[in-house]
Regions:
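Catalytic-domain carbohydrate-binding cleft regions of carbohydrate-active enzymes
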Residues: 1-168
């Protein structure tokens, strides 16, 4: 009681983790687990009423699979036929993917009350561009995106190597 919490950090169980095996693991996810969080906007509003900012953990490496609520919008944004169920593969080097990643997946949740993201990339340092670390790029783009409304940017992440400190 009377502990001065200022940020609610919600690990990966905010999203579905027990998914059909045909979609892979539940490590990556963008659909709220309604058993644990039946009304996400209400929960986020309550945390804000308690004076807390909110960050959600995200492991984006597996892209967006067909079981996700946002899959049809993500597929459409990337020119994928949603009826086929082909995953929207994560690709930090693809401008169209990055735009959809923020516009389709993250911004709607921010409108519901998520203040910033905990980028928890653990899937290696390779992209289609040799030498370009996906975590470093994710931190860069999350930081830039967090400034779009004119405020000071903020990214919560794993250490991405030299230069990571430039993204608070």
């Amino acid at each position: 009681e009377q502990i001065p919490f200022s940020v609610a950090v919600i690990d990966m169980d905010w999203h579905l983790v027990d998914i059909p095996p045909k979609y892979g693991t539940g490590w990556t996810g963008y659909t709220w687990n309604r058993e644990l969080f039946p009304d996400p906007p209400e929960f986020l509003a309550w945390l804000h009423e308690q004076g807390m900012k909110v960050t959600l953990n995200v492991h984006p490496a597996d892209g967006v699979r067909a079981h996700e609520e946002a899959y049809p919008r993500m597929a459409e944004a990337l020119g994928i036929d949603p009826a086929g169920g082909t995953a929207a593969e994560f690709d930090v080097t693809d401008r169209a993917f990055l735009e959809a990643y923020f516009d389709v997946l993250h911004h709607p949740m921010e409108e519901d009350g998520v203040d910033f993201w905990w980028v928890d990339w653990q899937q290696g340092k390779k992209t289609r561009i040799p030498g370009l670390d996906p975590l470093w790029m994710l931190n860069h783009y999350h930081y830039l995106d967090s400034t779009r409304a004119g405020g000071a940017g903020l990214t919560f992440s794993r250490y991405a190597g030299i230069g990571s400190h430039r993204y608070p």
